[in-house]
Amino acid sequence: MSTILESLPTGQKVGIAFSGGLDTSAALHWMKLKGAVPYAYTANLGQPDEDDYDAIPKRAIEYGAAGARLIDCRAQLVAEGIAALQSGAFHITTAGVTYFNTTPIGRAVTGTMLVAAMKEDGVNIWGDGSTYKGNDIERFYRYGLLVNPDLKIYKPWLDQTFIDELGGRAEMSEFMNQAGFAYKMSAEKAYSTDSNLLGATHEAKDLESLESGIKIVNPIMGVAFWRDDVKIAAEEVTVRFEAGQPVALNGVEYKDPVELLLEANRIGGRHGLGMSDQIENRIIEAKSRGIYEAPGLALLYIAYERLVTGIHNEDTIEQYRENGRRLGRLLYQGRWFDPQAIMLRETAQRWVARAITGEVKIELRRGNDYSILSTKSPNLTYQPERLSMEKVASTFSPRDRIGQLTMRNLDITDTRDKLRVYSQVGLLTPGESSALPQIKGDSDK
């Protein structure tokens, strides 16, 4: 039996993820007029461009909602964001600049917490504003059904009747004005923006063209660091972790992780830290492009990664990075709470993050330009005296190294033999400019 409803279920409770914007406002009022019983659920995700959350449920009631609730998701959002940081769950990078999966994390929190609230109210039909070409339609589908197996999905933007009547923003604005709500359509931007406390996503419209760059974006969490008229002074900041948890910035301890991340956003935002321009693969395998902001997570990640490399050994770090990339993809695909994701995440939190205690001092400049100034931790396995070039007491002698190098003769000989075989069968045909050695066997001499 299909869980997708293609037409409006009249006479039934329908929950809608309500942002208060034009799209969801028009959809809610339209559903009311068509005979459904709409309930509005608004997630407080600490969006930097939203300054009055309390007014949103009131507007929903005004537009015809039978009930409206504001769900504070900030603590859970930050908890999941820190869990992603601890496990390195970030798979999208360009030349070392990372996208911190802030929208997928937000969808995991929104999808589960709003549907849980709906379930409490006896609402088993859910709608939201995601389109059929994007990632969110699948993310919300998965998270919603995880929480409520009886959930049905109704999306006005998949209902042809709704599309025929209110297919564009101009039509929706006129519809709301005719209903007496004097709804003023906001100015059309050159791109769309979605944000939460962890970060912001700018995409679509003009940004779909790769000829348009980051310079057309007006940052909402930081500064346009690429502009010459934006003055940015270098700033030193210290970040302290205890057992994998960020606990202090510039010596100030924060008991509330939300407040710590807000301050990290302010610090990083002053420099435009954490902005990136990425080409990525959506869940349906089509490529898309986004410009992202995440100043606070970027700041914490610099310090966390520095401590990871100073505390853990090479094989542990390699496993952490490989698992992190796999986990990042699962998170992106809406599988953050799937068993395989939980296994990868908790492994990193237990065996990597728990040892991360220490303090890192960083100098921030413009954009992602920074320097690490100092690293302190009681758990460091970095011991400079072991490899010092000065004359100090050493853990091994020159004779020990001679023995170690002599043992390498075995695999060097094996490598030489393999290269010779590859050359004989035509797999290797190095020319004069090749860095590969001209391998010859005894019979070739």
Curated annotation (Swiss-Prot):
CDD domains named in the record: ASS
GO cellular component: cytoplasm
Positions contributing to ATP binding: A17, F18, S19, G20, G21, L22, D23, T24, S25, A43, G129, T131, D136, D194
PROSITE patterns: ARGININOSUCCIN_SYN_1 (PS00564), ARGININOSUCCIN_SYN_2 (PS00565)
Pathway annotation from the record: Amino-acid biosynthesis; L-arginine biosynthesis; L-arginine from L-ornithine and carbamoyl phosphate: step 2/3
Chain positions recorded as L-aspartate binding sites: T131, N135, D136
Protein known as: Argininosuccinate synthase
